[in-house]
Amino acid sequence: MRWIGLSTGLVSAMLVAGLVACGSNSPASSPAGPTQGARSIVVFAAASLQSAFTQIGEQFKAGNPGVNVNFAFAGSSELATQLTQGATADVFASADTAQMDSVAKAGLLAGHPTNFATNTMVIVAAAGNPKKIRSFADLTRPGLNVVVCQPSVPCGSATRRIEDATGIHLNPVSEELSVTDVLNKVITGQADAGLVYVSDALSVATKVTCVRFPEAAGVVNVYAIAVLKRTSQPALARQFVAMVTAAAGRRILDQSGFAKP
């Protein structure tokens, strides 16, 4: 992956830290069912957490033999809506505090949420950057097909905040439900460029060119995680949250492009 607007030293540090392409970028599906007789937890998590949480889940299972971790990855607002409409899960991890607050206001949290990571936005362009995109303002050029997230989801809210702060308003050809949907449209050539989180751009390192822009630094999404009141495995749910926020989880989050809260 080529990075524009990012120092060579930082790119090298990211590569040394183990940032490699993620094998799958398909839309999230419902969690797989647990193995018969096994204890399991269901984790509803923002789509941007897919790579990091899959790795954390493997470590969690290794430390808890016989336990399954079943993930549902999707846009945070979609997951929050499912929870408030009666869906059952053990843990919720949101890409912003607003969606966590909506679940808290519905009385669905077993305790207080914990802020565990932050993320910022980056432009992803088709591999090689054939449209020569260099800045956020370039996304307004005539004839450029740009995709973003819907304003109702955290990545779309972040995009809107950047627009408001800069006075530069985009005219996207589509608004997607999650960052993975935005990435897929750029990777498959359905769009020339899109706005996603840094962590998601790193997960498709060989398939896109990333363009850093200074305006993104002023808009930071804070990720929150909490145990849900409807959990059937409260002890395991708390252990999973503890792993995410402890050193083992922090290492994986760092390697996946997330910053500390």
Swiss-Prot record:
Keywords: Cell membrane, Lipoprotein, Membrane, Metal-binding, Molybdenum, Palmitate, Signal, Transport, Tungsten
Lipid attachment locations (N-palmitoyl cysteine): 22
Record's signal peptide: 1-21
Keyword presence, Zinc-finger: no
Family affiliation: Belongs to the bacterial solute-binding protein ModA family.
Further comment: Was identified as a high-confidence drug target.
Protein known as: Molybdate-binding protein ModA
Organism placement in taxonomy: Bacteria, Bacillati, Actinomycetota, Actinomycetes, Mycobacteriales
Gene it is expressed from: modA
